[in-house]
């Protein structure tokens, strides 16, 4: 694919996945290559369970939007796209980070790293595109249908973590 077509495709993809984040009052932090980093609960926090529910609603809507985009791509003779989503919840440091020449509002901390590691694990579980931590699972309570994938080793963590596949939300 030529560079112009690749950029056009990435922009279509980002449009499809950014909308659900904004609809759930999430923050679009940054686009990194073909990835989107988003947060919920910063700079305003609505409560732990509310933020966890907003994040998983956005993730499920992102999956639905990707399915629609893939139908369009297939009609255009292009290969479908795949995505993996990792969701974790925890205390982070939020603020402007960078140099005097360029500052960006972002979050840092181990919860950010663990969410990224969960996203990476989706490559090992391609049939489970949305992975959540035990912390998120607990916050969701009976609102979510999940499948436990067991304890998984995670780069940078001393012990394996319990990983769940998000299937759906219950009304």
Locations of regions flagged by a protein language model:
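Catalytic NTP-binding/metal-coordinating core of nucleotidyl cyclase/transferase enzymes
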Residues: 1-57
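Alpha-helical scaffolding flanking metal-ion-dependent phosphate/phosphodiester catalytic sites
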Residues: 55, 87-90, 111-118
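Conserved, well-folded catalytic cores of nucleic-acid-processing
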Residues: 46, 62-65, 69-72, 100, ...
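Cytosolic regulatory/linker segments at or just downstream of nucleotide-handling modules
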Residues: 92, 115, 122-171
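Residue-level signature of catalytic and energy-coupling elements of molecular machines
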Residues: 17, 33, 87, 118, ...
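Catalytic strand-loop-helix junctions within cyclic-nucleotide turnover domains
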Residues: 39-50, 85-105, 122-128
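Allosteric regulatory "coupling" segments in signal-transduction proteins
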Residues: 49-52, 104-108, 148, 152
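Catalytic core regions of nucleotide second-messenger enzymes
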Residues: 24-25, 29-32, 63-86, 152, ...
């Amino acid at each position: 694919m030529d560079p112009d077509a690749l950029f056009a495709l990435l922009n279509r993809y980002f449009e499809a996945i950014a909308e659900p984040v904004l609809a759930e009052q999430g923050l679009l932090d940054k686009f990194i290559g073909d990835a989107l980093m988003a947060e919920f609960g910063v700079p305003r926090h609505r409560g732990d369970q509310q933020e966890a529910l907003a994040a998983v609603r956005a993730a499920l809507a992102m999956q639905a939007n990707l399915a629609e985009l893939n139908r369009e791509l297939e009609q255009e003779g292009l290969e479908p796209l795949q995505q993996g989503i990792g969701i974790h919840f925890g205390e982070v440091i939020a603020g402007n980070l960078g140099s005097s020449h360029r500052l960006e509002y972002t979050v840092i901390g181990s919860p950010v790293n663990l969410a990224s590691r969960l996203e990476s694990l989706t490559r090992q579980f391609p049939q489970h595109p949305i992975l959540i931590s035990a912390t998120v699972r607990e916050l969701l309570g009976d609102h979510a249908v999940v499948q436990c994938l067991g304890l998984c080793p995670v780069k940078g963590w001393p012990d394996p973590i319990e990983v769940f596949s998000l299937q759906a939300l219950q009304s």
